[in-house]
From Swiss-Prot:
Keywords from the named record: Nucleus, Repeat, Ribonucleoprotein, RNA-binding, rRNA processing
An example molecular function term from Gene Ontology annotations: rRNA primary transcript binding
Localisation: Nucleus
Family: Belongs to the RRM MRD1 family.
Record's protein name: Multiple RNA-binding domain-containing protein 1
Region described as Disordered: 80-289
Chain's role: Involved in pre-rRNA processing.
Record domain RRM: where: 4-76, 301-379, 484-556, 597-680, 702-779
Gene encoding the protein: mrd1
Length: 825
């Protein structure tokens, strides 16, 4: 997908979003503007990639408030430089957090409350008024007697002489000094004194990050001997035990681990793996979110698309999302009070895989200058029919309910200009001033032909009215349907425009309401697609007057862009569809599209595309095609460059001359066009050959094949129906062996113009309830050389059959099965 955003750097420090929007919208139409003031950068979105390229080249290295800005096309989020910058930013952040956590752990390690010697010292110097006089002073020594000694202390003990030990012991007994405790503590790292086994287990649980508490156990304090008390006051083991007791004490110390080292080990391991665990957790959470979104999308096949431009419509979103699969519905949310888009939409796919693929490919991508954010949407609410309750209703009522519920999704098989037969005959009878009984004489054999003529007259009048009001009749040939206009059909004759307006206005704002003077069909256009959808669901198959209302979605691009909407019915005269001999010959003398006139257009902008070039010349009368001359781009293989000129083809020379006068000097993409007549060198013989070929083709288009012909129709009915539009050479209706019609026929006119008039007039007409399907029949070859080739081919096939017959035998021979076996026996 092409990028539609530009990156702006070097902005003034106090630049705002509104100022950035005003600066770029002075020359281009923008959809988004965002400024990061601390970094002095910003992003601007445009409707198309061409506009973004032009803005980048125009505003690059310009000045804004004495600041030189740099403008370039923004890089996608998934590009390689952006990924590297993101990775570097995450790495620096994790390093900072690791350093901070290390310092925090180091500070947390200085926990003075776990030092028993310091606690004992604080208890000694505490005021007597704050101490508990009834408490035992040697409570700190209850569990110290089981504390093991380290190997270093045992070796030092063996090296000391008994005299030093006795002397040291004598001094300690004589005068125990509290000040010696911190001095001895400098020889080794302070070890926390465990007051109870329960507290030891609790400290281990806290170090492992567990929350489960262990219930404390109460044990009675045992009396402490003098040797144990002295051992607790010294940092070195004194030789107060016998050799056997010392060996037993050493083995106990080796078996029992040091609990103080376990929290430190756990903290170091946690410090090493904290960042890796955090990154792994973040990545796993993102993967889980993506997997969850995909699961939800597979269930609903529906996407929620946000951060869209406020002027985006369903037609803009459809080419973007239809690449991944068939779309059932696109709904853009509108504010009912302000009649503006809310900036988000829902896309409903038919297949879940298509929705998942669109989610993966388009999430975070550019669309008209904005980054789309796609999320899974809940399934659309559907109103299902209760089959049990429906079965209790009459069969006719069941069909009506089902048909109304399926109206919005079903397609119709009849033609778009279908009209109620009764309404057509009522309209014609009123104009002629006669009753329908007189118009349709039951004793007449050609009542069906009269009805077909009346319908044809009304259809031609309706076409003339729609053309005068900006309706593109060629749009009825296409299958693509729009989402704002509705064709209203099959209502009774006598329904007025005001009646239809009152019927449709409660569903939304009507921008256009067209009803021909015949009053047999109407076109209603709404301002928003959701309003048209509501009206379609609410009014489909509703009874209006004496008939049921038929609604059909109008074709896409039904109205010309140059025609302003009209909500009133114009009073137009009924146009007669009869063709006189003078009209026929006048038409024959008119300009035929035999030679196509071409205009040469130069001084084009090199950025102008073929679509833009065609869009400018297409509204002109007689336009056929437009193209810009290009050449291969040597720097970009596979791409093309504009050569700055092009050609425009028209049907006739007069139309080309009128276009030259209108478009010469026209300004297109800041370039003034120079339009001249194209002088293509052509051989006189080649030009004469083209004219002869065109005349031959025009002469051949005189025979019409009539398909879907009713089986009750006769040759007389076909001649009566088609004879009103020209002189017929012959009429043929093929029949079966039982003399019944085969469902098609042929009508051969004298001139091609008469055949075309009959084709245009009767291609939407119904005969005995069947719509006639008309096509030009393929004539037999007129060129003598082609006739000779066909004869030679036929003779060759006959010769091949004769040769094959000679090889296989000319006749049947009689032979006896098993005769040879009897002879051998």
């Amino acid at each position: 997908m092409e990028n539609t955003r530009v990156f702006v750097s070097g902005l003034p420090p106090t630049f705002t979003n509104d100022q950035l929007r005003m600066h770029f919208s002075s020359r281009f139409q923008i959809t988004d503007a965002h400024v990061l003031p601390k970094r002095r950068i910003g992003f601007v979105g445009f409707k198309s990639s061409e506009a973004a390229q032009q803005a980048a080249s125009y505003f690059n290295k310009t000045y804004v408030k004495m600041s030189k800005i740099s403008v370039e096309i923004a890089k996608p989020i998934d590009s390689e430089p952006v990924k590297k910058a993101e990775k570097h930013r995450k790495g620096s952040t994790s390093n900072d957090s690791t350093a901070g956590k290390a310092l925090k752990r180091k500070r947390d390690g200085d926990n003075t409350q776990k030092d028993p010697q310091l606690q004992e010292y604080l208890s000694v110097i505490e005021r007597p008024s704050k101490t508990k006089t009834w408490a035992n002073g040697d409570d700190f020594l209850n569990t110290i007697q089981n504390q093991p000694a380290t190997s270093e202390l045992r070796e030092e003990q063996r090296d000391d002489t008994s005299e030093k030990v006795e002397e040291h012991s004598h001094k300690q007994r004589k005068k125990p000094r509290v000040d010696d405790v911190p001095k001895a503590a400098h020889d080794r790292e302070p070890e926390p004194m465990v007051l109870d086994k329960t507290e030891e287990e609790h400290e281990r649980a806290n170090a492992d990050g567990q929350v489960e508490a262990i219930p404390p156990t109460q044990e009675e304090a045992e009396p402490v001997s003098d040797a144990d008390w002295l051992r607790s006051k010294t940092s070195r083991l004194l030789g107060l035990l016998d050799e056997d007791e010392q060996a037993e004490f050493d083995s106990t110390a080796q078996r029992k681990p040091d609990p103080s080292s376990e929290p430190e080990t756990v903290s170091k391991a946690g410090a090493q793996h904290s960042d890796d665990d955090k990154a792994a957790v973040e990545s796993s959470v993102e993967e889980e979110e993506v997997d969850t979104n995909i699961e939800h999308i597979r269930l609903s096949s529906r996407l929620f698309v946000r951060n869209l431009p406020y002027d985006a419509s369903e037609s803009d979103l459809e080419p973007v999302f239809s690449k991944f699969g068939k779309i059932e519905e696109i709904h853009v949310a509108f504010d009912t009070r302000s009649t503006t888009s809310k900036g988000f939409a829902y896309v409903q796919y038919i297949e879940p895989d298509a929705a998942v693929q669109a989610y993966k490919e388009l999430d975070g991508k550019h669309f008209q200058g904005r980054l789309m954010h796609i999320l899974p949407a809940t399934a659309k609410k559907t109103y299902k029919i209760d089959e049990h309750e429906l079965s209790k209703l009459p069969l006719k009522k069941q069909k009506q309910i089902k048909r109304k519920l399926e109206a919005s999704s079903s397609t119709f098989s009849w033609n778009s200009l279908y009209m109620n037969t009764d309404a057509v005959m009522s309209s014609v009878a009123e104009r002629l001033g006669v009753s329908k009984a007189d118009l349709l004489d039951p004793t007449s054999a050609d009542a069906a032909v009269k009805q077909a003529h009346a319908e044809t007259h009304v259809i031609q009048e309706t076409k003339a009215y729609f053309t005068a009001n900006g309706v593109n009749l060629d749009a009825f040939k296409q299958r693509e349907r729009g989402n704002t206009a509705i064709l209203v059909k099959n209502f009774s004759y006598g329904v007025k425009v005001d009646d239809l307006r009152k019927l449709f206005e409660p569903y939304g704002q009507i921008t256009r309401l067209l009803m021909p003077p015949s009053g047999t069909i109407a076109i209603v256009e709404f301002a928003r697609p959701d309003e048209a959808q509501k009206a379609f669901k609410g009014l489909a198959y509703r009874k209006v007057g004496d008939s049921i209302l038929f609604l059909e979605k109008a074709p896409a691009n039904l109205f010309d862009a140059t025609t302003a909407p009209q909500t009133s019915v114009l009073e137009t005269k009924a146009v007669s569809q009869g063709f006189s001999t003078a009209d026929t010959f006048a038409a024959e003398d008119g300009d035929e599209p035999v030679v196509t006139s071409t205009l040469f257009v130069k001084n084009l902008n090199f950025s102008t595309t073929n679509e833009r070039f065609t869009e400018v010349f297409k509204p002109l009368d007689g336009f056929v095609s437009a193209r810009i001359k290009t050449k291969p781009d040597p720097k970009r293989p596979g791409k093309t460059l504009s050569m700055g000129f092009g050609f425009v083809d028209f049907r006739t020379k007069a139309q080309a001359q009128a276009a030259l006068a209108a478009m010469d000097g026209y300004k297109l993409d800041q370039h003034e066009l120079v339009v001249r007549a194209s002088n293509k060198a052509m051989d006189a013989a080649e030009e004469r050959r083209r004219e002869d070929t065109a005349k031959k083709i025009a002469a051949r288009r005189t025979k019409i094949i009539i398909k879907n012909l009713p089986f009750q129709a006769t040759k007389k009915d076909v001649r009566s129906l088609f004879g009103a539009y020209g002189q017929l050479r012959s009429v043929r209706v093929p029949k079966k062996f039982d003399r019944s019609a085969r469902g098609f026929g042929f009508a051969d006119f004298v001139s091609a113009r008469e055949a075309e008039n009959a084709m245009d007039a009767l291609k939407n007409t119904h005969l005995l309830g069947r719509r006639l399907v008309l096509e030009f029949a393929n004539e037999e070859a007129v060129d003598p050389e082609q006739e000779i080739e066909q004869i030679e081919k036929k003779v060759g096939e006959q010769l091949d059959r004769v040769k094959l017959q000679k090889l296989t035998g000319t006749g049947r021979k009689k032979f006896t099965v098993g005769a040879q076996e009897d002879e051998e026996a």
